[in-house]
Amino acid sequence: MALLSVAPLQKPLTSCSPFSTTMPTLGVCTPRKVVTPSIIMCSTTAVSDAGAKRRIANHHSNLWGDDFIHSLSTHYEAPSYRERAERLIKEVKEMFTEIEDGLSITPLSDLLSRLSMVDSIERLGIDRHFKMEIKSALDYVHSYWSEKGIGCGRESGVTDLNSTALGLRTLRLHGYPVSSSVLEQFKDEKGQFATSSIQTDGGEIRSIFNLFRASLVAFPNEKVMEDAQIFSTIYLKEYLEKIPLSSLSRQIEYVMEYGWHTNLPRLEARHYMDVFGYNEMPWMSYGNTEKLLELAKLEFNIFHSIQQRELKHISRWWKDSGFSQMNFVRHRHVEYYTLASCFAIDPQHSAFRVSFAKMCHLVTVLDDIYDTFGTMEELQLFTAAVKRWDPSATDSLPEYMKRVYTVLYETVNEMAQVAKKSQGRDTINYARHAWEAYLDSYMKEAEWISTGCLPTFEEYYENGKISFGYRISMLQPILSMDIPFPHHILQEIDYPSRFSSLAAGILRLKGDTRCYQADSARGEEASCISCYMKENPGLTEEDVVNHIHGMVDDLIKELNWELLKPDCNVPISSKKHAFDICRAVHHGYKYRDGYSVATNEIKDLVMITVLEPVPL
């Protein structure tokens, strides 16, 4: 939302300098070079030119100086690293062949061995090299799937919780039609989940761990998955309080921290490399385990060199845009790029990562203009200019808006040209309609502020799903990919599809729970929390926040279904990046509004996944 503001445009207030320290967060304990920013907060009151009263938010300035970004270097671009990785890829494919031929496993363990192999490769972030092998392994497992689940092997004789839970999760994530009802048979007369009596303590813990992981991909109305999550959460928390630190305990801590809907594949890979070892797949030789780990580290570092190249492009775009001269907006281009590169980890998807970072930064700039800095008259002029979509539309705009409009116009058109090459058709009208709807939703919020109106919860929520900007951050980036998005598939993903509505709803609700207090302090009263409290005066603020969290949990299950439902006309691969945008942005709201205050977990994420390679 927007309106009255205070402060003239000024030069950027920051720069950053690197120094050596130890990373204290996210379970990565190796010493590394980090960037400690100089945090200078923008003032909250001032008078701009022409005497217009303006508000500005108390946002800290850019943490990552352009000079620092362009000083980054790496030696992992050398061909020798790529050649070594290619040799290891061939050797891992041979491991799959040995499993297929039964050379390294027996009929008593062939199902769990396949599942463990697929699971480890995915968690190490190298699964893109083994799509055919993974499909073959999962087809094999699914061929032995029954209403009671599976055992460790096709000749096990009895089903077990560990194999069934891991199978349920993995098969479901790959679109196989598997029912959660298989878990019912593992509940005892008290409703508790029981593991095999012959399992060791470590085996029992791993079974409950995989039960918890399976429960995270629940669909709506799956009571057994709700029971599984409650039971496994209590069990694992008690376990973590009792035992010393170990590889398994660190895995449990990570998954309980990030789950699936705030997990980022590159962050998970970085963490898993530190705990991956022989115990993950005891049937595999030590040498083969080391090869998997070496490949994961090489791939991580080779991609690190790609990140540096793309990040320099983003930083140059940001500097050339003139946004660095605007101290009333948040400068989070590096953070947005980091999120993109933490889930779009295929090197070929460079256009997606760059487009996502640019779109998100444009959304943030406009959010700060419409929410705080712009006057009502200026916002009306800017909205009208975007609807004209003509370079000459800047004539009626104030100086600071002219530059914003020009960068928006040029960037959107440039992305449309990229999409035209990948999709084989002109997509500029998709983008224009999305931006028009986005700015219209902002104008509605600006009117609420100017009139002191507090809308109904439903009115605010429906408008807020558009004003959050999910559609903007998703549409042009996915169209830049080499995945075809014909009109009928795009309709299933883009607004106002069920998929898009759920993803945007999750982010609007979650974002409001993190931002509503700061927004209210700036005069932006309307939020999911305030609107719901108005309609339910008997509830406390805490009651409403808890209710909103419950709504988010329900929407997540519905989004799971929209992504993973079997026999769908839209393949999972077509929806996956749109889904991953939702969970990446959700990640930024896990502890706080990580986009307004990017000095904590998000800063750590940049350092761990972008700035530093993993030691080989």
Curated annotation (Swiss-Prot):
Mg(2+) 3 binds at D519. The keyword Magnesium applies. It comes from the Eukaryota. Pathway: Terpene metabolism; oleoresin biosynthesis; Secondary metabolite biosynthesis; terpenoid biosynthesis. Its EC number is 4.2.3.111, 4.2.3.109, 4.2.3.108, 4.2.3.15. Mg(2+) 2 binds at D367, D371. One of its GO terms (cellular component) is chloroplast. Pfam families: Terpene_synth, Terpene_synth_C. GO terms for biological process: diterpenoid biosynthetic process; green leaf volatile biosynthetic process; terpenoid biosynthetic process. Mg(2+) 1 binds at D367, D371. GO terms for molecular function: 1,8-cineole synthase activity; magnesium ion binding; myrcene synthase activity; sabinene synthase activity; terpene synthase activity. InterPro entries: Isoprenoid_synthase_dom_sf, Terpene_cyclase-like_1_C, Terpene_cyclase_plant_C1, Terpene_synth_N, Terpene_synth_N_sf, Terpene_synthase-like, Terpene_synthase_metal-bd, Terpenoid_cyclase/PrenylTrfase. The Asp-Asp-Xaa-Xaa-Asp/Glu (DDXXD/E) motif is important for the catalytic activity, presumably through binding to Mg(2+). PANTHER family: (E,E)-GERANYLLINALOOL SYNTHASE, ENT-COPALYL DIPHOSPHATE SYNTHASE, CHLOROPLASTIC. Monoterpene synthase (TPS) involved in the biosynthesis of monoterpene natural products included in conifer oleoresin secretions and volatile emissions; these compounds contribute to biotic and abiotic stress defense against herbivores and pathogens. Catalyzes the conversion of (2E)-geranyl diphosphate (GPP) to alpha-terpineol and, to a lower extent, to 1,8-cineole, myrcene and (-)-sabinene. This is Alpha terpineol synthase, chloroplastic. It comes from Pinus contorta.
